[in-house]
Amino acid sequence: MAHKKAGGSTRNGRDSHSKRLGVKCFGGECVSSGTIIVRQRGNTFHPGKYVGCGRDYTLFALKSGKVLFEKRGALRRKFISIVS
């Protein structure tokens, strides 16, 4: 006979891989065309001048220059632009 009672099973013990989201190039940093600036879920940051937006809301540089973070509009939305 067993001298220990059987242990119960658990429904925990899983976790998803991190998605490596966030700002990849910060304000004042020089970037070349096509460089990813931000990976995000939804529009936390909005594309400004010379910044494109991918279908997963990734922001990337459309031309070479320096990254500029700014707040614009009545809602004070965060925009990212490329300045030369």
Curated annotation (Swiss-Prot):
InterPro entries: Ribosomal_bL27 (IPR001684), Ribosomal_bL27_CS (IPR018261). GO terms for cellular component: cytosolic large ribosomal subunit. One of its GO terms (biological process) is translation. Keywords: Ribonucleoprotein, Ribosomal protein. Residues 1-20 are annotated as: Disordered. Pfam families: Ribosomal_L27 (PF01016). NCBIfam families: L27. Belongs to the bacterial ribosomal protein bL27 family. This is Large ribosomal subunit protein bL27. The lineage of its organism: Bacteria, Pseudomonadati, Pseudomonadota, Gammaproteobacteria, Enterobacterales. The gene is rpmA.
